[in-house]
A protein has these predicted regions:
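Auxiliary Fe-S-binding modules of radical SAM enzymes
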Residues: 1-34, 242-390
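Conserved, mostly hydrophobic/aromatic
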Residues: 18, 42, 72, 112, ...
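Canonical radical SAM enzyme core domain
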Residues: 82-97, 117-169, 181-182, 197-201, ...
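Alpha-helix-loop-beta-strand connector modules within alpha/beta enzyme cores
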Residues: 120-145, 171, 197-215, 269-287, ...
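Catalytic cores of alpha/beta
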Residues: 160-164, 225-239, 298-309
């Protein structure tokens, strides 16, 4: 079937020949009026990678602190401990552990996000907690930190990137979440997150993670002051990083949310922009296996449509008592939790097969559950042995 926009024919030829798309190609894809053709092309590339599979994970999501001194202009979540102490929260390791188990143990991923908190972001805090999770919940993969937090800990402990990655891997780190990438273009990055890890160090840390066998994801924050050129440049840099040091599992487009931050004048992204971004990412990032449509960001309706535009993952259910605060502080209207049966229905209605996974895309039967003995010891939740059962 021919494309209404003949530019897509040339893009298809390049993809079929294994030729990476250029900056001009990426801009043309963003600007094409043939939305149906764009979706058809992206969908074909998705199905080359993962066929009719669409992935999701049963996970727990925890914000462990909102104390952060990075000062990003797009953030509505961070609290300054000295200027607004009434907003501050900070969980102890025991509180994090108990929160993770609040709704049981039937999950395969623990996703924790915090901030640049000097009292929490240290190896002394995290390594004992990570080892505890690995000892008592070995079926759960730890998806923790961003490159910004890893750089912060490296500076704090006077360690090189290889040394800090080695220390975290030894404690049980399975996957790094992919945040803090924002936009790599220096002119834009210097305006939205001047105190955060540089684009070069973000890439260097992720490549070191991959060299040491720790997987990661990659994100892009779009819909604020960046240009289309910035977006395509960001994708090209990620593609080149994947060529040098394979290990990125998924790319996650993150739509900017404007409520309560310095960039509120930018407003909300529109549905067509969201859908185009998923499709362009699938076509530009030929060496990324997965493009994730995170329902917490774009909402379930847009994410279901994104499955027809190159996305093949809807991220995690979260726990029924989890409370995501970063995007909810910025105005998201998404809920906090999606029952896995709802994920399966949405995926099947889009014409795909739901696949339960963990952080590194190992697949599980949909009805898989861990066998865990729970007990209460001196008022705290403790676990016994863990093994999977169908």
């Amino acid at each position: 079937m021919p494309y209404a926009d003949t530019m897509l024919v040339e893009v298809e030829r390049k993809l079929d020949a294994g030729v990476p798309l250029s900056m001009d190609d990426g801009l043309a894809l963003y600007r094409t009026w043939d939305l149906h053709g764009l979706g058809r092309l992206a969908r074909a590339q998705k199905e080359r990678k993962s066929g009719k599979k669409v992935f999701y994970v049963l996970n727990r999501y925890i914000n462990s602190t909102n104390v952060c001194f990075a000062g990003c202009t797009f953030c509505s979540f961070a609290a300054d401990e000295f200027k607004e102490p009434q907003r501050v929260f900070r969980m102890t390791p025991d509180q994090v552990f108990a929160k993770a188990l609040e709704t049981g143990t039937n999950f395969n991923q623990l996703h924790i996000v915090g901030g640049h908190d000097p009292r929490q972001l240290s190896l002394d805090y995290w390594r004992p907690l990570m080892r505890r999770f690995k000892s008592e919940l070995p079926h759960v993969q730890l998806s923790l930190f961003t490159a910004a937090e890893i750089e912060y800990m490296a500076k704090r402990h006077r360690l090189s990137f290889p040394e800090i990655v080695s220390a975290l891997k030894e404690a049980g780190l399975d996957n790094v979440n992919g945040g803090a990438a924002e936009i790599f273009a220096e002119g834009t990055r210097s305006k939205i997150c001047p105190n955060k890890v540089s684009a070069e160090n973000w890439v260097a840390i992720h490549e070191e993670l991959h060299r040491q066998g720790v997987a990661s994801n990659a994100t892009m924050l779009y819909g604020h002051i960046e240009s289309l050129e910035d977006r395509v440049d960001h994708m090209i840099r990620l593609r080149e990083s994947q060529e040098r040091s394979p290990g990125y599992n998924a790319f996650i487009p993150l739509a900017f949310h404007p409520d309560g931050n310095e960039l509120s004048y930018c407003g909300w992204t529109m549905g067509l922009d969201d859908i185009r971004t998923f499709a362009v990412a699938r076509l530009m990032l030929h060496n990324f296996d997965h493009i994730k449509a995170y329902w917490m960001i774009q909402g379930l309706n847009v994410c279901q449509v994104a499955l027809q535009f190159g996305a093949d993952d809807m991220d995690g259910t979260h726990g029924s008592t989890d409370a995501e605060m970063i995007y909810h502080s910025a105005g998201t209207q998404s809920g906090q939790y999606v029952d896995d049966r709802e994920f399966r229905r949405l995926i099947e209605d889009a014409g795909y097969t739901p696949i339960r996974r963990n952080s590194t895309y190992n697949e599980f039967p949909l009805d898989w559950t861990p066998s865990v003995t729970l007990s209460v010891v001196e008022g705290q939740l403790a676990t016994g042995s863990v093994e999977g059962r169908k």
